[in-house]
């Protein structure tokens, strides 16, 4: 009998019952926010049900919070719908005794930054949230994925979830990347390789020497974008780097419980003889700094490359999609992607708003300042830390002063311009170099044009005024 994959082991450890090819899984951690919970709590109220495990639930305010003036509190939020959602969340969590990091609390921030930062995310766990990028937590060897509002209600009521088991895929990234290439480039390269539907029906385990060399924050970036490849979740087996990241965090085990946890966590890895349903291998040395050119995360090109022609695609549907994307993005087939001028630069989101992301961007900006360069004229650039604690750390290191000296806006934490649900939005026709995870039509604002890239690449674009090769700034 073949060995088990990491996914198999986590699944088996959480099955409560099985029937007709489906299972009831126990959920270790439920993360909630203001957008996907109002109806779920209303359903509990109608049914007269309590929250089953408030202690395994954590709430934050992130999606539609403004990134300025948070100290004024929820009641001062200008947008009526956003204010109501935030007020409703505060009322619901107070009623059910759920820990809540609200606006103005230094611990608050984007849910997928806060969970790991607090040590709530741990190896071997099952983690769900009403947000598709819950896959971020897979960087710790946790089975983590998004759920819908009706499932949010079910987990609140029962601490379980009905699931059908996915297939196993392994993506190995081997070798040493070139300078200027990192986790975001890996993620975009994987999506470019398999497409946005390539992972459908799978849970992806990332492995290989280049993945092992990533920091925990880099691993979170890689797992975050798994959903853009169509997969249910992304996983990376825990190792010494994982344990070092977790040790001493507020919710991490302490004392003797830490040693017991380590013994347990070390069992969560794929066996050597485990069989994967699909396996893909990428050479890190062949991955260049990467950006998107179109309106799907699979529309990727090396920064040194050209915008593709619709005629280069193999099917009529793909050709039509590419033609539409070029029209929407205001690009011409065959033009160098570096000719695309940018109006806005956004450094933030659950993909790239952690301290290492800000350090990488600030390093590019600092070098530009040494040469007398700042944010290019006509470019609006903003940096939005992923949490209040990230913001504090960045300010302690002086990163905020670097950004502000170059002309960047330094904001308060939140999802911000990742999605058009708060005041940070693109105007129609504006082009944005963004460190977020989705470049769909209108994602950052109606008519906005989004190019996904790494924090360092986004910083380079802000200085150059157009998409630029970060290696020219190193």
UniProtKB/Swiss-Prot annotation:
Cofactor (UniProt): [4Fe-4S] cluster
Pathway: Amino-acid biosynthesis; L-leucine biosynthesis; L-leucine from 3-methyl-2-oxobutanoate: step 2/4
Pfam families: Aconitase
Keywords on record: 4Fe-4S, Amino-acid biosynthesis, Branched-chain amino acid biosynthesis, Iron, Iron-sulfur, Leucine biosynthesis, Lyase, Metal-binding
GO annotation, biological process: L-leucine biosynthetic process
InterPro entries according to UniProt: 3-IsopropMal_deHydase_lsu (IPR004430), Acnase/IPM_dHydase_lsu_aba_1/3 (IPR015931), Acoase/IPM_deHydtase_lsu_aba (IPR001030), Aconitase_4Fe-4S_BS (IPR018136), Aconitase_4Fe-4S_dom (IPR036008), IPM_dehydratase_rel_enz (IPR050067), IPMI_cat (IPR033941)
GO molecular function, a single term: metal ion binding
Cofactor annotation comment: Binds 1 [4Fe-4S] cluster per subunit.
EC number: 4.2.1.33
The reaction(s) this protein catalyses: (2R,3S)-3-isopropylmalate = (2S)-2-isopropylmalate
Subunit details: Heterodimer of LeuC and LeuD.
Protein name: 3-isopropylmalate dehydratase large subunit
Organism the protein comes from: Phenylobacterium zucineum (strain HLK1)
Taxonomic placement: Bacteria, Pseudomonadati, Pseudomonadota, Alphaproteobacteria, Caulobacterales
Gene name linked to the record: leuC
